[in-house]
Amino acid sequence: MRFNELNENKMWYKTIPQILEWLESKSKMPWIWLDTETTGLGGPKQQQLTQVSAIATQYDFKNNNFSEIGTFDEKIKLTDETKSKFDEPENKTKWVLGFNHYGSGDYKYKNESDIVDDFFKWIDNYSPNILVAQNAGFDMAMLSGRYGHKITNEVFDTKMLIQLYLLPLLQALAETDTKYKEMIDFIGTSGRDNGLISSSMAKIGPVLGINMTGYHDAITDCRITIQMYQKIVELLRNNQEVDIMKYQAERIKVIRESK
């Protein structure tokens, strides 16, 4: 996959003030928050997109506020290949569609290739920009891999902010404050995080006090991701003196070993 992903190495081994400075340096251009829904997690050769959504924003870093300057939200017709899977024993496509609210809302369902083309034309309206997503690699693989579009934009994965900054901060604070220990216990661990504290938005959102109603609808998830990011930045700003290096290094070691 070819896109200029903001590789996690660029976010490794920074202090809290350094990561805040890095985020501020990116705040002059539009931030486009995006999410996709698909028929499964098998990737662009096995699954199709069912929803592509994004919110273009201007970032007021000083006040940690985002102003919406545009939205993209489209649902996609099921391909014949997808429909043919419905009758396969053990196939979970129908369950996934229900999980992702497919069929709900006042949408005109359109062809997948047209929507992907339209999406890339739409983001060009805000160039240069930075694309922001939770677990960005998956969405970028689907958007670029289905019809061969190249993603040249900078990409920022909020999952990296969680893994390398939020969670290490909570761990450091938990050493002396039971409130943060309770937050960590609520989040729990995850196999997807190689047994470390989960970086899933489904766990991080609620512990930060975010209303998750409508979660797994792409446009809703964009808004939840914005709120989650704002809460994380607020926590980081309020704890800039905390040394997170021990816990960050532990996470980086596991990320390296899992590659």
Predicted regions span which residues?
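Acidic two-metal-ion nuclease catalytic site recognized across multiple nuclease folds
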Residues: 2-22, 180-192, 207, 219, ...
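Conserved non-catalytic scaffold segment of RNase H-like nuclease domains
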Residues: 6, 10-144, 152, 195-198, ...
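Catalytic phosphate/metal-binding cores of nucleic-acid and nucleotide-processing enzymes, i.e., regions
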Residues: 38-49, 59, 64, 145, ...
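Active-site catalytic pocket residues across diverse enzymes, especially alpha/beta-hydrolases
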Residues: 58, 147, 232-236
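Short alpha-helix plus adjacent loop in nuclease-associated cores
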Residues: 158-193
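Short acidic, glycine/serine/threonine-rich helix-capping segments at coil-helix boundaries
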Residues: 211-218
